[in-house]
A protein has these predicted regions:
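Internal acidic/polar
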Residues: 4-6, 92-117, 150
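Sigma70-family region 2
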Residues: 41, 54-69, 89
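Amphipathic, Lys/Arg- and hydrophobic-enriched alpha-helical face
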Residues: 25-43, 60, 127, 176-179
Length: 180
């Protein structure tokens, strides 16, 4: 924790800020990319959202209160940016977020950055049927292998509530996979 506080101090100090922010990007670019990609599913869109996420992190570092881990705070920003991006994209297209997500899933097979097979496409279709919060919880637990405590910090939900949502999501996905 002391090490994180020192790093945050470097991020806020004008003399060390650039070097510290470069380290932050190097350390967190891959996990944040993967997290955002799990939400928006498209490589190019993920790159755009990731860039916006780092801009927002940089702009808001002075407001970071240290009530959660830096990692959790950045994940929360990335999650909000990804969800906002999807809502804006759906609004621009004049369709619902669910319809947009189904279109993106249909395009996954043509995405050169997606190396999944038929089963993974089916899994993504099942996930798309879940409510937004269950999707997030499932993806963070299943794909990113985050602990419930970390997800709780990121989403601001109790661990018990997360476990229940994850369990319900798993049951819905199992039912979809069995019937399709």
């Amino acid at each position: 924790m002391q090490e994180e506080q020192e790093f945050i101090a470097q991020l806020l100090n004008l003399k060390t800020q650039n070097q510290a922010f470069q380290k932050l990007i190097v350390d967190y670019q891959r996990p944040l990319y993967n997290h955002i990609r799990n939400i928006v599913l498209n490589h190019d869109d993920t790159d755009d959202v990731l860039q916006n996420t780092f801009i927002k992190i940089f702009q808001n570092l002075k407001n970071f209160k240290g009530e959660s881990k830096l990692f959790s705070w950045m994940y929360r920003i990335a999650t909000n940016e990804a969800l906002s991006f999807l809502k804006q994209k759906a609004k621009k297209s004049g369709i619902s977020s669910e319809t947009l997500q189904n279109k993106v899933i249909d395009n996954l097979e043509a995405d050169i950055f997606f190396d999944g097979n038929e089963i993974q496409i089916k899994l993504q279709k099942a996930i798309a049927l879940l409510p937004e919060k269950q999707q997030l919880i499932f993806k963070m637990k299943y794909f990113e292998e985050l602990k419930y405590e970390a997800i709780s910090e990121i989403l601001g939900t109790s661990v018990g509530g997360l476990k229940a949502s994850y369990h319900i999501a798993v049951k819905k996905i199992e039912a979809f996979v069995k019937t399709n």
